[in-house]
């Protein structure tokens, strides 16, 4: 990608975030085009893509035959097919899996590094973008297209926008916003996704979890009414037989080091500590607070105390902006 990422700054929690323009270089774009695009994706992901409108985007999972997620995909209609955004670390293996049956269909599946991914969030983000685009997405219309640009709207943790565009428009946006917006890199968007409870699947956790272990059902990313797709039997069994005992949690507190994706944490049990969970992502905020996204048992006590392994500091559970009650 020729567009140069912005230098990193310590991320800020959404409640205190000034207007910020971010380069999302830790995320990557991919597309499927061709006459069979919809049918093909319908047989591969957990969401009902046939019901997706032009002005919708959603988080779906692409699973293996055992129902474990290769990746999750932020999916939207693009041209005569679909585009999706996923973590860059999983894009290549995910596309390899997705292409396995493509020889039998009229589809072309490819990475897209021509377009640039930008995020806009923070204080008066809508007002800042309103001067640059004739229409902005909203709760009622979550995807808006204008020329070479697609804008995606997110409600949580506070209103923000993801922009998929060409290099020329990305440069124009940077020039126009440079004076009033702080510039930051992917870590700020990652911090917002952790706060929003959007599961982050990097390479370390690819092929490890069924979608429900990362709350995908609560985020509208699983259809239990659609036809067959890879891994469907296991995903359905987890729902109808209560086989899923895990959930995605948000922890906050202090830690002397950031836990890495795939690492476990420790849970306080009386005077002792017991290993628990799998970290999906973690970020240290500019106020020193550490936020951690972790998959653990779904019956954790709300006042449980955790720590990064052998650390002197502790982490506690924070509420997510959505309910897990079905």
From Swiss-Prot:
Domain of life: Bacteria
Keywords assigned: Cytoplasm, Folate-binding, tRNA processing
Protein name (database record): tRNA-modifying protein YgfZ
Family that this chain belongs to: Belongs to the tRNA-modifying YgfZ family.
List of residues binding folate: 27, 189
GO biological process: one example: RNA modification
Described purpose of this protein according to its UniProt entry: Folate-binding protein involved in regulating the level of ATP-DnaA and in the modification of some tRNAs. It is probably a key factor in regulatory networks that act via tRNA modification, such as initiation of chromosomal replication.
Any one GO CC term of the record: cytosol
Entries under InterPro entries matching the protein: GCV_T_N, GcvT/YgfZ_C, tRNA-modifying_YgfZ, YgfZ/GcvT, YgfZ/GcvT_CS, YgfZ_barrel
A GO MF term: folic acid binding
Annotated localization: Cytoplasm
Main localization, broad class: cytoplasm
Any matching Pfam family: GCV_T
HAMAP family, A to Z: tRNA_modifying_YgfZ
């Amino acid at each position: 990608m020729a567009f140069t990422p912005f230098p990193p700054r310590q991320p800020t929690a959404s409640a205190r975030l000034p207007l910020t323009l971010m380069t999302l270089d830790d995320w990557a774009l991919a597309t499927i085009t061709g006459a069979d695009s919809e049918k093909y994706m319908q047989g591969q992901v957990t969401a009902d893509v046939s019901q997706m409108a032009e002005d919708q985007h959603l988080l779906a999972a692409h699973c293996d035959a055992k129902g474990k997620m290769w990746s999750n995909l932020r999916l939207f209609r693009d041209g005569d097919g679909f585009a999706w955004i996923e973590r860059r670390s999983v894009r290549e293996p995910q596309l390899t899996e997705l292409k396995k049956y493509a020889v039998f269909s009229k589809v072309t599946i490819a990475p897209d590094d021509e377009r640039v991914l930008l995020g806009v969030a923070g204080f008066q983000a809508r007002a800042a973008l309103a001067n640059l685009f004739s229409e902005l997405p909203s709760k009622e219309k979550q995807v808006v297209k204008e020329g070479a640009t697609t804008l995606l709207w997110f409600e949580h943790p506070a209103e923000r926008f993801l922009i998929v565009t060409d290099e020329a428009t990305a440069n124009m946006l940077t020039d126009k916003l440079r004076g009033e917006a702080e510039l930051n890199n992917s870590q700020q968007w990652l911090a917002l996704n952790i706060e929003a409870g959007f599961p982050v699947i990097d390479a370390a956790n690819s092929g490890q979890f069924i979608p429900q272990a990362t709350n995908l059902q609560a985020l509208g990313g699983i259809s239990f009414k659609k036809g067959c797709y890879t891994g469907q039997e296991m995903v359905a069994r987890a729902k109808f037989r209560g086989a899923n005992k895990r959930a995605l949690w948000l922890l906050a507190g202090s830690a002397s080091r950031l836990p890495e994706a795939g690492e476990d944490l420790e849970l306080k049990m009386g005077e002792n500590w017991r290993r628990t969970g799998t970290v999906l992502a973690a970020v240290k905020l500019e106020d020193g607070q550490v936020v951690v996204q972790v998959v653990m048992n779904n019956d954790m006590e709300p006042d449980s105390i955790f720590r990064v392994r052998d650390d002197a500091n502790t982490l506690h559970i924070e509420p997510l902006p959505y309910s897990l009650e079905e």
